[in-house]
């Protein structure tokens, strides 16, 4: 009898194991290998695109941007703007719940915009919302937002990934810890966040769009090494990987189970120079460094051809971008300018990077070698997200150790103000925003401010051109390249792609 029971138990165990294996196989679980870690899951307090991209798992905004960076309605149904450009009235969708069961309504919008526009909260994205004078809940589905002054790009601010609707109940419950406890209206809710290893999100059963999401879970896994990221895709450890190491693109393209995608981008890579510090306060030094870098060679060496040399300080696909004659590679001219500037034997400096993945390392090494050829000794440091937040984003001009800084920017609003003001306006030095050159020019400030007060395209073109002309001439940057976005995914994964600003779109993602 005992032997018979034992056999029955084995059979039952075998059936149970088979069923569990079947269920596990049937579960639609996707692993996404990304290039760096996340700083926070509070979109209003994140300066990096990746953290905001992952936060889209939980959160949605009133508006969003599609693949072509065109405005689309999300939690809002429509909007109107007053003739004076001061008041925006937004009509909301009805019947939407936050993941904690509370209602999304006009009061929730007010709570979020009040928080975002209050400087006392010290949120990293405050500058996006500082022009809001007040937000009113007219009725449960109507919000009126009054600005301090006309701001023609404001609707694009509401479409920015930072402008997420967080549950007011969660804001009250978690306070400053909301970055660890995301609660939104999005398709997924938080399962686990291991801060050194991964963020796992699971399907939100109460999501308001019928039939979505189609995946059961997404695990966002930071993998700094490019080759490891590609290998995870080939072994099936990951179903989506971005960025793909450019040198491995051709190899992955040959894999019958993998689809490679090279997408258009608004991601500009550049090196800022701290113009408040010697020797970068000398325009001739900045000009010399621009001549010292062979951009076409950089495209080949670090990006395997998946980039184009920069022809301005705003990527060409952004409205009102101006293009200029690219800086030629001329090390002889660079040495002449350094001599004229009082540095005939060059100088020593530091070159930091905002990322530590393999492509960033290649850019650092290439730039270090190029600078050495004109007598400049650059000590390079590739930072992770935590180092960047502490040493670059968190320190003002007097405390900052930034000298040369390799980084990138994508104007996630899809318009020119967000491509220029955060990076060049005098009021946007760190820790306020990302003007890591500590650049300041009153004319540029005035042109950028005036451009926000007009809706006339011709006048905006004139003003943005004038600002870019000055910036290009004064050269607080070494503009390098505009990237192409190379990602890869398992062929059985659909509806998962990279946005031009390097964010992710995955609302319709499915695993066949």
UniProtKB/Swiss-Prot annotation:
A GO MF label = peptide transmembrane transporter activity
CDD domains for the chain: PBP2_Ylib_like
A GO cellular component annotated for this chain's UniProt record is: ATP-binding cassette (ABC) transporter complex
Q: Record's PROSITE patterns?
A: SBP_BACTERIAL_5
Q: Where is the signal peptide?
A: 1-26
Organism superkingdom: Bacteria
Provide the protein's localization: Periplasm
Q: Does the keyword Transmembrane apply?
A: no
Q: Which GO biological-process labels does this protein carry?
A: dipeptide transport
Output the InterPro entries linked to this UniProt entry. Peptide/Ni-bd (IPR030678), SBP_5 (IPR039424), SBP_5_CS (IPR023765), SBP_5_dom (IPR000914)
Q: Which SUPFAM superfamilies match?
A: Periplasmic binding protein-like II
User: Which UniProt keywords are given for this protein, alphabetically ordered?
Assistant: Periplasm, Signal, Transport
Q: How does it assemble?
A: The complex is composed of two ATP-binding proteins (GsiA), two transmembrane proteins (GsiC and GsiD) and a solute-binding protein (GsiB).
Concerning PANTHER family, the annotation shows: GLUTATHIONE-BINDING PROTEIN GSIB, PERIPLASMIC BINDING COMPONENT OF ABC TRANSPORTER
Q: Which family does it belong to?
A: Belongs to the bacterial solute-binding protein 5 family.
> What role is this protein assigned?
Part of the ABC transporter complex GsiABCD involved in glutathione import. Binds glutathione.
Indicate what this protein is called per its UniProt record.
Answer: Glutathione-binding protein GsiB
Q: Which organism is it from?
A: Escherichia coli O157:H7
What is this organism's lineage?
Bacteria, Pseudomonadati, Pseudomonadota, Gammaproteobacteria, Enterobacterales
């Amino acid at each position: 009898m005992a032997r018979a029971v034992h056999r029955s138990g084995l059979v039952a165990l075998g059936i149970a194991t088979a069923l569990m294996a079947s269920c596990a196989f049937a579960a639609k679980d996707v692993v996404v290998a990304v290039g760096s870690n996340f700083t926070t899951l509070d979109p209003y307090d994140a300066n990096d695109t990746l953290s905001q991209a992952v936060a889209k798992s939980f959160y949605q905004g009133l508006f969003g941007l599609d693949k072509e960076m065109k405005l689309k309605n999300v939690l809002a149904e429509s909007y109107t703007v007053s003739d004076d450009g001061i008041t925006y009235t937004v009509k909301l969708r009805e019947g939407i719940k936050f993941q904690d069961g509370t209602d999304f309504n006009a009061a929730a919008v007010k709570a979020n915009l009040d928080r975002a526009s209050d400087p006392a909260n010290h949120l990293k994205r405050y500058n996006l919302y500082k022009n809001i004078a007040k937000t009113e809940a007219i009725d449960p589905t109507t919000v009126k937002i009054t600005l301090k002054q006309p701001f023609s790009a404001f609707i694009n601010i509401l479409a920015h990934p930072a402008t997420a609707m967080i549950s007011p109940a969660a804001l009250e419950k978690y306070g400053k810890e909301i970055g660890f406890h995301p609660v939104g209206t999005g398709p997924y809710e938080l399962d686990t966040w291991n801060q050194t290893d991964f963020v796992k999100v699971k399907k939100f059963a109460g999501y308001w769009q019928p039939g979505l999401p189609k995946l059961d879970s997404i695990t966002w896994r930071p993998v700094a090494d490019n080759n490891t990221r590609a290998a995870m895709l080939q072994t099936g450890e990951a179903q989506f990987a971005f960025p793909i190491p450019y040198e491995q693109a051709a190899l992955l393209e040959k894999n019958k189970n993998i689809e490679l995608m090279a997408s258009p981008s608004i991601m500009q890579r550049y090196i800022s120079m701290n113009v408040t510090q010697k020797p970068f306060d000398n325009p001739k030094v900045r000009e010399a460094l621009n001549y010292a870098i062979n951009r076409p060679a950089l495209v080949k060496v670090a990006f395997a051809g998946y980039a184009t040399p920069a022809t301005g300080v705003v990527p060409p696909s952004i409205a009102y971008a101006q293009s200029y004659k690219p800086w030629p590679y001329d090390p002889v001219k660079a040495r002449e300018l350094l001599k004229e500037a009082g540095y005939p034997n060059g100088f020593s400096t530091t070159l930091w990077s905002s990322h530590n993945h393999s492509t960033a390392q290649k850019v650092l090494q290439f730039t270090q070698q190029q600078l050495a050829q004109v007598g400049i000794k650059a000590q390079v440091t590739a930072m992770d997200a935590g180092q960047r937040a502490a040493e670059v984003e968190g320190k003002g001009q007097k405390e900052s150790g930034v000298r040369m800084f390799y980084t990138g920017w994508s104007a996630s609003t899809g318009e020119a103000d967000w491509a220029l003001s955060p990076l060049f306006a005098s009021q946007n030095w760190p820790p306020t925003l990302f003007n890591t050159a500590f650049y300041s020019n009153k004319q540029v400030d005035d042109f950028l401010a005036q451009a926000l007060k007009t809706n006339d395209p011709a006048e905006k073109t004139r003003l943005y051109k004038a600002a870019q002309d000055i910036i290009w001439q004064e050269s607080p940057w070494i503009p390098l390249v505009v990237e192409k976005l190379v990602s890869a995914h398992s062929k059985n994964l659909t509806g998962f792609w990279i946005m031009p600003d390097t964010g992710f779109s995955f609302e319709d993602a499915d695993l066949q």
